[in-house]
């Protein structure tokens, strides 16, 4: 009887094991080999010392994260002075990668490789504070899953690819502090964007107009050579919180603008903006930073606490043309 029970128990255990799904292998050989090639291409830096064939599970390595299936889905290398060379083409072998961050790597140089398009699951791409140079490859727009792209503080040149406007999931684009030239592509200041930062470049021409109701919250186009009208950015219904258009050559009438109630930061200084300071600006209780200096604004200032509470500096050096000088600012 006992032997029969033992036999039945053994059978049940065997069936249970056979029916159980096979456990995913953490860090498959293809991922490990790709990481080792990346390390070699970057000069075998001490920063990546844990990347070793002696360690079976690359999911435990520094600067690496894996998903539930055991695939490498996040590589982040930052603040390393011993990383040298170009962005390795071997990165393309990490086919499950969702996030790639190469940040504060002064020894990283060369172009952005077109092979990144093989990363069809990539959502977050950061290549920032490096010496990466050359043009932004148009092929990046083939990565349809991209949600956030940060290519700031590099030495990138040439235009912003028009194809960036067609990325269906892109919510944040940061290209500040490069050497980019040309116009802002039509459709980039619109739609699904929540944050668009293109400051400290050499961009020219008008800001492409779009009157769609969108979710954009942050626009920083400062320190470029942009011209024309930017008043449409403040259209009714836009939940915009931060706008920095300073140090351009923008020319539009400020008088009748109605600013969104969510606005917390507004810098329009060093342009050719004209008109008067609208009363709607004085009503913004959330506004923390304001600068309208070095324009062509005329007076008087609205006699409301919401304007004067920022002090007089935000209104300095306005050369009014054809009207009363901008005055009436007296701090108590």
UniProtKB/Swiss-Prot annotation:
Disulfides per UniProt: 27-58, 59-66, 298-312, 298-320, 320-329
Expression sites (tissue/organ): Highly expressed in calli, immature and mature panicles, and in three inner floral organs: lodicules, stamens and carpels. Expressed at low level in seedling roots and mature stems.
Keyword rRNA processing set for record: no
Pfam families: LRR_8 (PF13855), LRRNT_2 (PF08263)
LRR repeats: 72-96, 97-118, 119-142, 143-166, 167-192, 193-215, 216-236, 237-259, 260-283, 284-310
Top-level taxon of the source organism: Eukaryota
Gene Ontology terms: cellular component: extracellular region
InterPro entries the UniProt entry points to: Leu-rich_rpt, LRR_dom_sf, LRR_N_plant-typ, PGIP
GO biological process terms on file: cell differentiation; specification of floral organ number
Deletion phenotype: Increased numbers of floral organs, including the stamen, carpel, palea/lemma, stigma and lodicule.
Any GO MF annotation of the entry: enzyme inhibitor activity
Residues bearing attached sugar chains per UniProt: 131
Function in brief: Inhibitor of fungal polygalacturonase. Regulates floral organ number.
Name of protein: Polygalacturonase inhibitor 1
């Amino acid at each position: 009887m006992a032997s029969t029970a033992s036999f039945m128990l053994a059978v049940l255990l065997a069936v249970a094991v056979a029916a159980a799904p096979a456990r995913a292998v953490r860090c498959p050989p293809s991922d490990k080999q790709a990481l080792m090639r990346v390390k070699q291409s970057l000069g075998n830096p001490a920063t990546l010392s844990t990347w070793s064939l002696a360690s079976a599970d690359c999911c435990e390595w520094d600067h690496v994260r894996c998903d539930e299936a055991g695939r490498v889905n996040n590589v982040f290398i930052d603040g390393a002075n011993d990383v040298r060379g170009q962005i390795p083409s071997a990165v393309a072998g990490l086919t499950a990668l969702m996030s790639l961050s190469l940040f504060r790597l002064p020894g990283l140089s060369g172009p952005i490789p077109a092979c990144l398009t093989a990363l069809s699951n990539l959502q977050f791409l950061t290549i920032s504070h490096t010496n990466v140079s050359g043009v932004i490859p148009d092929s990046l727009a083939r990565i349809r899953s991209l949600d956030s792209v940060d290519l700031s503080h590099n030495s990138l040149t040439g235009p912003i690819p028009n194809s960036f406007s067609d990325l269906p999931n892109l919510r944040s684009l940061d290209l500040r502090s490069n050497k980019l030239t040309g116009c802002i592509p039509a459709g980039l200041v619109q739609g699904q964007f929540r944050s668009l930062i293109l400051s400290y470049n050499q961009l020219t021409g008008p800001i492409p107009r779009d009157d769609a109701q969108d979710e954009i919250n942050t626009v920083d186009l400062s320190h470029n050579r942009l011209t024309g009208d930017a008043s449409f950015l403040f259209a009714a219904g836009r939940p915009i919180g931060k706008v920095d258009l300073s140090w351009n050559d923008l020319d539009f009438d400020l008088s009748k603008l109605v600013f969104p109630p969510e606005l917390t930061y507004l810098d329009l200084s060093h342009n050719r903006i004209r008109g008067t300071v609208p009363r709607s600006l004085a009503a913004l209780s959330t506004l923390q930073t304001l600068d309208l200096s070095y324009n062509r604004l005329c007076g008087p200032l609205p006699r409301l606490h919401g304007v004067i509470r920022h002090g007089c500096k935000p209104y300095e050096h306005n050369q009014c043309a054809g009207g009363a000088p901008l005055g009436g600012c007296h701090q108590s």
